[in-house]
Structure formats: C-alpha cells, structure tokens
Amino acid sequence: MFMKQLVKHLIIAGFSAAILSFLISFDAVYTGFSSSFGGTLSHFFIHSFLLIGLPLALFTDAVHRILHLKRTHTLFTKLGLYATVVYVSWDSAVWLAAAMAVYFLIECAFFPVGRAKETTISM
C-alpha cells in the first residue's frame, strides 16, 4: 500500500511540475528565481517537482488521512491549491503554508468528517 501511494504522489508531482515548467517556459507564470538563476527548463522542472508538486501531493493525502475521508482527491481542490501557491506565493513559504491551511479548512468545511453515531441510553 505504501509503494502504491508513493508512486501515485510521484506521478501527481511529476505532472504538476511538467505543467508548471511548461507555463514558466512561455512566461505565463512569473517567477522571481528565473532571472537570478538564469533558469533552464530542467531547473524549473526540478524546482517545481521538489518544492511544489511533491510537498503538495503529500500534504493533500495527509489531509485525507487525518480527516478519514472516503473519497479520492478531487481535481478541483487540488488545482485550486496549486493555483493559489503558484499565483500568490512562488517565493514565500508563509504563503505556501497559508494556502495549505486554506485547503485544509475547505476540506473540513465542505466534506464533513464521518462521526461515530451517538447512542442514547434511555432509563
């Protein structure tokens, strides 16, 4: 089970990094590090994979495990989280943490956790 999850996260992170690298190569996404490091496409891919794609894939899975949700990741919430991180917070770890907190709150608000049924004892 662990290897299956790991492979799933690597695939999600790889596709996310590939899309982000593609957008960066066409200047669709502004990045602060592109001018300072000279940035090649492989540099963008590695940066996106290690610093954005993989941590977010692991984080979203952890949220699902903590909340004991019985559904798979939805494309909408994951893309919303990625868009928030890329658009607002490329260089800021604080904004990345804020985006993750918002994602967690959205999951808590819209997808309620299954609670154990309360039993009443009649006397």
From Swiss-Prot:
A GO-annotated cellular component: plasma membrane
Keywords noted in UniProt: Cell membrane, Membrane, Transmembrane, Transmembrane helix
Keyword Cell membrane: yes
Subcellular location: Cell membrane
Segments crossing the lipid bilayer: 7-29, 44-66, 79-101
Membrane topology designation: Multi-pass membrane protein
Protein name: Uncharacterized protein YugM
Source species of the chain: Bacillus subtilis (strain 168)
